[in-house]
Amino acid sequence: MKRQQLLLLILAFGVFSILNTEMGIIGILPMAAEMYQVDIVQAGMLVSLFALGVAIAGPTMPLLFSRFNRKHVMLLVLGVFTICNALAVVASDFQLLLVLRVVPAFFHPVYCALAFSVAAASVAPEDAPRAVARINMGVAAGMVVGVPISNVLAATFDFSAAMVFFAGVTGLMFLLTMAFVPDLPVTQPMRYGAQLSVLKRPPVWLAIVAVICLNGSIFGVYNYLADYLQTVAALPGELIAALLLVYGLLNICGSYLGGNLLARCPGVTVRLFPLCTITLYCLLFLGGGKLLPLLAALIVAWGILGGINANINQYLLACVASDAPDFSNGLFLTAANLGCMAGTMISGF
């Protein structure tokens, strides 16, 4: 049991280190623009090209690496992230920095898909949602914690200090994985064609559409939350920052809660989630911008729902393609990214 818990902990922190590299740079884009003498739109490519790399690699890279020793694959991915982050510290021009961002992006879904698969396989089937929830907590923490830490480091020192932080975290996880993760050979590798054949199943495509819609419904609106709080609710900047932090922290709590709910009553959880989300948005539309206590309560509920959402999305594809876990988790990552992109575009109108 202790070894199992240690494995889940290392996987969760490993995912945190990957997401920390992806999301941590968001808050320091202006500093990157200043350091490399580019405009903010060009600096934004450090985020958008990374996300594009993840979306492209999602269905392919986990599939390609599914037959190799899982520990070796984890070390490869963490090694690539560490080397690229370390080289980014001394990157002399913006084009080189972009390359050093794009290369690890293609390995991002490999580690994340692997983490979900290994976590689910390390416990009894009925406990798999709880184990996966631990990994999603690492995802949420990477999105929430990475941004403020990198922001503080870059503001206190310079942009390169944030890159040192990214390299240090992935490097530490490389060492911990090497030392404490047992050898994880794939005893019965599944043929690539057999894994791809899951795409012939209509429920798989229904699950993909559901993930796109669910993730779009959460992040499509969340991406405009700061603007909503400023322009509609007319809140001061300090309070907006506090509410965004509360939302992020409750995402972590929601991930934990979502795992327990899916383990106990998966059908009810999946069916009620869209209804709860619709109700929340209706209340937000009707009175969220006028009543601060109601707005605060809705953001609390929204943060929890956001965490539950990630677990439901992974669960939907895992159920309909359980015989190809690495490939299905790669599809989940791609569908989630497409949902975020589509939701953001539609909500912007």
Located regions from the model:
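Conserved MFS/SLC helix-loop-helix module at the cytosolic interface between two early adjacent transmembrane helices
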Residues: I56-S92
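Helix-loop-helix hairpin linking two adjacent transmembrane segments in secondary transporters
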Residues: L96, P125-E126, R130-V181, Y224, ...
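Helix-to-loop junctions at the C-terminal end of transmembrane segments
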Residues: G58-N69, G254-P266
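A late C-terminal transmembrane helix in Major Facilitator Superfamily
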Residues: V320-F349
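C-terminal transmembrane helical hairpin of 12-TM major facilitator-type secondary transporters
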Residues: V268-N313
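Paired small-residue
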Residues: C84, Q95-P104, P293-A301
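Helix-breaking motifs and short loop linkers at transmembrane-helix boundaries and internal kinks
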Residues: Q37, N69, V90-L96, G287-G289
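Cytoplasmic helix-loop-helix junction between adjacent transmembrane helices
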Residues: L100-G138
